[in-house]
């Protein structure tokens, strides 16, 4: 008998296949006393080393299949394995308590996990999840238990799991794994983000799928609506095969738009750009018809290594992206480290709230030579294409002036040394701090463009961490207050003859696109896989009508009213 579950649609598409259950292994053990303490310490160190090797291989595969930016998550796990502040106490516990390695590992990590989970800071709570993932891996090697390896799947299946760790998701082979469904998770969870990168259907947060599915059961995953059907009837299979076929035809229609400009029904052109993390991501931008790179996150050049990238290394990376876009615009964001992004070789102060602390441009000003090195590399790369530079986390006009003056100083030095540098580099800022949005009219007199980073702008405006489930209901992209800030920024730029882009998740959201078009946004920068879908939508919209829609939305009281307004319009 068919059973239907409802979850959260995390990645578009339909999958119909037999279930592959990713079951947690039995990692139970007995606490024992050891007599040969040194041998026990060596056994623990051996398990650590095997785990490091294994994780390094997983990271390499993730970088190859998903891109360097998605592989960065494993750097956090490797940092845990290499952290003497964690491994040291475990070894001390073995020596002092004469206990087996399994017990020392469990008890010591329990202490750290409890400490991190009790913190208000979401970033620190995520470190607890990293420790749990690493502990499971090390414990499995101590016990000689094999952790299920999704990379070994060699037949068409849908993966069913309570949750998928980043390690699990990075090993999924797209040729065989047609989709996945989990008990827990949300649209912004790691597993959901990975699913969209892999471009496979996914439904998360069903609460009970693992209790409802047995190995080899036929399962339908509807990543469009968030439905899951176990033991579907022939009629249901036929129905979803039709939806799957229609969706494939829809994607084929979108593919026809690859080489077209993005023009609304009434002839208004906007630019659809892509967010990237490495030069390897360019292939996806080009294959999806990206008109520009709206955000190049340079921090990924600094991650996954044990020292700062040299000027030459940076120059080669920037040159590859700028030249690879063949004259199309490339907006490069200078180093945005701090908050949720750390470097193992850069000591940062411990802060109660790192998202409001020493990060991004603030960190660059305090480490000026680091900043100057990056700017020199960017200036040298500018002659190979259409390079634009923007500074993150700008709160005051003086901060922009300081960053601009450092760049102009480096430009003058390079020219004096005979190095060719473009004279047409546009300089802009990220609008992610409400203070910058409110003062956009003054910034617009000095910058060449704005790029609205909605992920942080929404968090800072609503005072709500979007990864904190207790307050995530306040993370509201459609709240009229957010829309008013966006309009304020766009209007300020246009008054000075400048342009505004958006590089947060909101830019590719199909509910937000009509509103943003009506607000006058010039550039929409999103994940490459969302470009063609968004282009298709915009080509069906009349921009003059969207202006009226946006005006009406600005005068609503709640986010729910705005969504209802857009849905009512798009349904007509």
Curated annotation (Swiss-Prot):
The biological process GO terms on file are: N-acetylglucosamine transport; phosphoenolpyruvate-dependent sugar phosphotransferase system
- Cofactor requirements of the protein: Mg(2+)
Q: What is its main location?
A: cytoplasm
Its recorded reaction(s) are: L-histidyl-[protein] + phosphoenolpyruvate = N(pros)-phospho-L-histidyl-[protein] + pyruvate
Keyword line: Cytoplasm, Kinase, Magnesium, Metal-binding, Phosphotransferase system, Sugar transport, Transferase, Transport
Q: Which GO terms describe its cellular component?
A: cytoplasm
Q: What domain of life? A: Bacteria
Q: What is recorded about the domains? A: The N-terminal domain contains the HPr binding site, the central domain the pyrophosphate/phosphate carrier histidine, and the C-terminal domain the pyruvate binding site.
What this protein is reported to do is described as:
General (non sugar-specific) component of the phosphoenolpyruvate-dependent sugar phosphotransferase system (sugar PTS). This major carbohydrate active-transport system catalyzes the phosphorylation of incoming sugar substrates concomitantly with their translocation across the cell membrane. Enzyme I transfers the phosphoryl group from phosphoenolpyruvate (PEP) to the phosphoryl carrier protein (HPr).
> What is said about its interaction partners and assembly?
Homodimer.
- Recorded protein name is Phosphoenolpyruvate-protein phosphotransferase
Q: State the organism named in the record.
A: Listeria monocytogenes serovar 1/2a (strain ATCC BAA-679 / EGD-e)
């Amino acid at each position: 008998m068919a059973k239907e579950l409802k979850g959260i649609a995390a990645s578009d598409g339909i999958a119909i296949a037999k279930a592959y259950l990713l079951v947690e292994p039995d990692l139970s053990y007995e606490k024992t006393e050891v007599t040969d303490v040194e041998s026990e310490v060596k056994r623990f160190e051996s398990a650590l080393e095997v785990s490091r090797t294994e994780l390094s291989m997983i990271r390499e595969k993730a970088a190859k299949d998903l891109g360097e930016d998605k592989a960065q998550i494993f750097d956090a796990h490797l940092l845990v394995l290499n952290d003497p502040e964690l491994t040291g106490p475990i070894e001390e516990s073995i020596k002092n308590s004469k206990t087996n390695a399994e017990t020392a590992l469990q008890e010591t990590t329990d202490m750290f996990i409890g400490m991190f989970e009790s913190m208000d800071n979401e970033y620190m709570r995520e470190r607890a999840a990293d420790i749990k993932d690493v502990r499971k891996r090390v414990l499995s090697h101590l016990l000689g238990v094999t952790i299920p390896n999704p990379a070994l799947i060699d037949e068409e299946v849908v993966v069913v799991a309570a949750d998928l760790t980043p390690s699990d998701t990075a090993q999924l082979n797209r040729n065989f794994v047609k989709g996945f469904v989990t008990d827990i998770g949300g649209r912004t969870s790691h597993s959901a983000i990975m699913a969209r990168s892999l471009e496979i259907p996914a439904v998360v947060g069903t609460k009970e799928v693992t209790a409802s599915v047995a190995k080899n059961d036929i399962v339908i995953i509807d990543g469009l609506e968030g439905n899951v059907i176990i033991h579907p009837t022939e009629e249901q299979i036929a129905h979803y095969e039709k939806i799957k076929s229609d969706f494939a035809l829809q994607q084929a229609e979108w593919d026809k738009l690859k080489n077209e400009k993005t023009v609304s029904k009434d002839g208004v052109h906007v630019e659809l750009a892509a967010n990237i993390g490495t030069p390897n991501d360019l292939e996806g931008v080009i294959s999806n018809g990206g008109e520009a790179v709206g955000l190049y996150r340079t921090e990924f050049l600094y991650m996954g290594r044990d020292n700062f990238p040299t000027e030459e290394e940076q120059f080669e990376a920037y040159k590859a992206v700028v030249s690879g876009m063949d004259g199309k615009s490339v907006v490069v964001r200078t180093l945005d480290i701090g908050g949720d992004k750390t470097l193992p070789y850069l000591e940062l102060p411990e802060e109660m709230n790192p998202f409001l602390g020493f990060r991004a441009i603030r960190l660059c000003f305090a480490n000026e030579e680091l900043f100057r090195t990056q700017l020199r590399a960017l200036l040298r790369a500018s002659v190979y294409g259409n390079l634009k530079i923007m500074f993150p986390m700008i709160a005051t006009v003086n901060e922009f002036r300081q960053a601009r003056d450092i760049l102009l100083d480096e430009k003058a030095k390079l020219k004096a040394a005979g190095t060719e540098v473009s004279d047409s580099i546009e300089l802009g800022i990220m609008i992610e701090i409400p203070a910058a949005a409110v003062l956009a009219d003054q910034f617009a007199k000095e910058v060449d463009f704005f790029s609205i980073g909605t992920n942080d702008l929404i968090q800072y405006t609503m005072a709500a961490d979007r990864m904190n489930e207790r307050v995530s209901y306040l993370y509201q992209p459609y709240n009229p207050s957010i829309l008013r800030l966006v309009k304020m920024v766009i209007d300020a730029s246009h008054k000075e003859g400048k342009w505004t882009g958006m590089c947060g998740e909101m830019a590719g959201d199909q509910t937000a696109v009509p509103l943003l078009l009506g607000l006058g946004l010039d550039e929409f920068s999103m994940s490459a896989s969302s470009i063609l879908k968004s282009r298709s939508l915009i080509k069906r919209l009349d921009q003059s009508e969207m202006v009226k829609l946006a005006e009406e939305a600005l005068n609503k009281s709640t986010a729910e009213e705005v969504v209802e307004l857009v849905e009512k319009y798009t349904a007509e």
